[in-house]
Every structure is written in C-alpha cells, then in structure tokens.
C-alpha cells in the first residue's frame, strides 16, 4: 500500500523513498499517482471476494480500468478485457465476462483479478498473497500464469508471501522481512542454501523436509 500511496489516514510515509522508473514517487501528488495506479503499477490483493465489487459484473470492472487508463472506447476496452481473460485461462470468456464475482470459484476470481491488473500492461505487478486461499492445484496454475505473463509482457512482479515453497518455485530474488524491516536480501538460491540472518534460518528450519533425520 505504501508503494501505491494508499495508506489510510492518519498513517503516512515519514521517511525514505520509493524509486519507480527512476523517480521518487513519494513526492507525487494524488493526481500523478492516480495516473500510475492500475496503469504502470498494478496490484493483486489477497482476498478476491472483497477486492472485486459484488454488485458489478466482471466486464464492468475490467472495462472501467481499461477505459480510464488506455483511453479506449467501450467496444475496444471490452475486446481487450476478453483478450486478458483468455490469457489467464478463463474458459468461455465471452460468456463468463458477464458473470458476477460470486458466480466464479476462488481460482477463477483470482484469474479475473490478474487479468484486470494486467489489462493495462503495467511495468510492475504487486501480488499480495495471491494463492493463500487456493488449493495446491489451483495455486500451481495461478503461479504458472503469473510466470508466463511476466515472461511474455516483461512485467516485473513483487510477490508478498509467507510460503517458502511458492518463493522457491517462482522468485529470483528475496527479501526476508520481520516487523516491517528487511532482515536479509539476496538471490533465492543463496538465501535458501546459506541463510545468514537467524530469522531466515528459523524460517527455513520450520519447513518439513523428507531428507532430514528425525531425532
């Protein structure tokens, strides 16, 4: 939320900087940020049931974002929305785009959220626990989609998660956080193989391993 400058009052950014595309966006006005949010920086929130408006169809919510940032008419924006639904693997997109969020399964809602977030081809996608409420099969599908889209579109992804398995499968670089502060950072391979901070070591030791002898 800090990156998007969406912290509710009285919360505020007291110090530091957020450099995006070579510029410190902490100094941006609300008008400047509104042009970036959903356009250059997009976010997938953890709870899809509350992130999607239950009284509007998927089409209405996707088209609004595309019209706002891409300056397209409704017809072109709808075509773009359909293309994105196809990209994330939603079957029968021409029919499902007219569904309400409650008519989608958890995995389908997450796909719709990803499609909406990527509809304006952002440079950065922030994914906050995008697979937490999903079973392992759907989780794997969602992670595959995110990886493929990152490769195809060049979108960078910041993945916020507590799941070390997801990190190992998906990420290149890792920052271990505790109490809102970075404890350790480096490549996933380096930290998993040789964690330096006690908190990182504790996290990795907490993961059950089949190759570890039980005492």
Language model features: what each stretch is:
Residues 10, 91-95, 187-215:
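Short catalytic/signature loops enriched in Gly
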Residues 23-24, 64, 76-95, 204-205:
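Conserved ABC ATPase "signature" region
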Residues 25-42, 60, 68, 190-195:
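ABC ATPase NBD coupling module
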Residues 119-123:
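A short, proline-enriched helix->beta-strand linker immediately N-terminal to the Walker B motif
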Residues 167-169:
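A short, surface-exposed alpha-helical micro-motif characterized by mixed small hydrophobic
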């Amino acid at each position: 939320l800090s990156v998007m400058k969406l912290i509710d009052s009285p919360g505020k950014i007291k110090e530091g900087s957020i450099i995006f595309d070579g510029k410190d966006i902490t100094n941006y006005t609300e008008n400047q940020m509104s042009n970036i949010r959903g356009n250059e920086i997009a976010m997938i929130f953890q709870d899809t049931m509350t992130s999607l408006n239950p009284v509007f169809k998927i089409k209405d919510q996707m088209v609004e974002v595309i019209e706002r940032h891409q300056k397209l008419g409704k017809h072109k924006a709808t075509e773009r929305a359909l293309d994105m639904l196809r990209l994330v693997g939603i079957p029968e997109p021409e029919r499902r785009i007219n569904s309400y969020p409650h008519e989608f399964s958890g995995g389908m809602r997450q796909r719709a959220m990803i499609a909406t977030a990527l509809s304006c081809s952002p440079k950065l996608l922030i994914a906050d626990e995008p697979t937490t409420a999903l079973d392992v099969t759907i989780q794997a599908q969602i992670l595959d989609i995110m990886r493929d889209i990152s490769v195809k579109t060049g979108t960078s992804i910041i993945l916020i998660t507590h799941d070390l398995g997801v990190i190992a499968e998906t990420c290149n670089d890792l920052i271990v956080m505790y109490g809102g502060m970075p404890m350790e950072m480096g490549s996933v391979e380096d930290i998993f193989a040789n964690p330096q901070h006690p908190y990182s070591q504790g996290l990795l030791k907490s993961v059950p391993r089949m190759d570890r002898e039980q005492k």
